[in-house]
Amino acid sequence: MDIFIDYETICINCQEKGYSFGYGMKTIEYRGFKILDLPQKNLNGATVYFEYENKPVLLKSTENQHYSEFGKFSMINARVGKSGLISRFTYSFSFPRKKPDEKQKPKIIEYVDVYRFKDKPYFFIFYTFRNLTGKPIKNFNFYQFYDFDIYGEDSYSNDIARYDSKSDIIYQFDNEKGLDMSLFAGIGSSSKNKPNNFECNTPQDIFIFKNNQVSLRNYAEKGPCDCAVALQWIRPIFKHNDLISFPIMMIAGLGNKNFFENVKDARKDLEIHQKSVIRAVDNISREKIDPKLQKLNFSKREWCK
């Protein structure tokens, strides 16, 4: 495998059963070199912000379960393909019923499809959302946050983060190794899904929803220092029963030239696989609640008995 991913799980026994606490990534390596190394939880994947019934809702790190005054976010279905390279997760964010006679709780379904490859310097995560609240959702914001550590935690202070406006890729590399020799890691989307905003910053200062601000600040470069990167997409209106999708690619490379060649190849492949993801999302089995997940409800005490 060109890219090795170590997922965050609750315990070894849970992993053997085929379940995990979502799809959170603990470490990522490219050809034996670390590009992600024990990141902060809020800088490790997807975050969603939106307005429902004129109230703001924020879900950080959507690979993990959340409880809040606005509702419950939990994984209801998890499947892995025979090859072990394709994983499909389904999550539900349920709002409290407003009326006793409501037959179903208003909810948003999130489908997460992870595509890995044996000999390619990239992998994909497709995030798809379905609005089943019965009402339009306003100002739906989808974010990707990553706290890359090029060559691992021991070298984190040498990183430089940049946003490339030509390819709409945000990436990090090691300043000591230089552009031509360094390991690179970055994220982006399809050619038709240009991010609205971006940010290169330190993990401590990167935008994390302070002072009611919901937009990234378009800082195009940071470093050399400990860096983190983020991209943001905005959908003003998310209508009832509509689907919205955010295809994400994570790319690695050795040297600037190799990295951007890999970006081109990854984007072509991403757009091909996106068609199969839509078919998978429409499969009714994706929303079938796994009784084991529902019963255990991700309680570590119960799960590990």
Question: Which residues does each predicted region cover?
Answer:
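Polysaccharide-binding surfaces and accessory modules of carbohydrate-active proteins
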Residues: 1-11, 15-19, 24-29, 39-42, ...
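N-terminal targeting leaders for non-cytosolic proteins
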Residues: 35-68
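Beta-strand-rich interaction surfaces with strong enrichment in secreted/lumenal proteins
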Residues: 112-115, 232-237
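Aromatic sugar-binding interfaces of carbohydrate-active proteins
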Residues: 157-160, 246, 269-272, 276
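Short, basic/aromatic beta-hairpin or loop at an interaction surface
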Residues: 214-225
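Short Pro-Gly-centered flexible turn/kink motifs
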Residues: 236-254
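Non-catalytic terminal regions with compositionally biased, polar/charged low complexity
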Residues: 259, 264-305
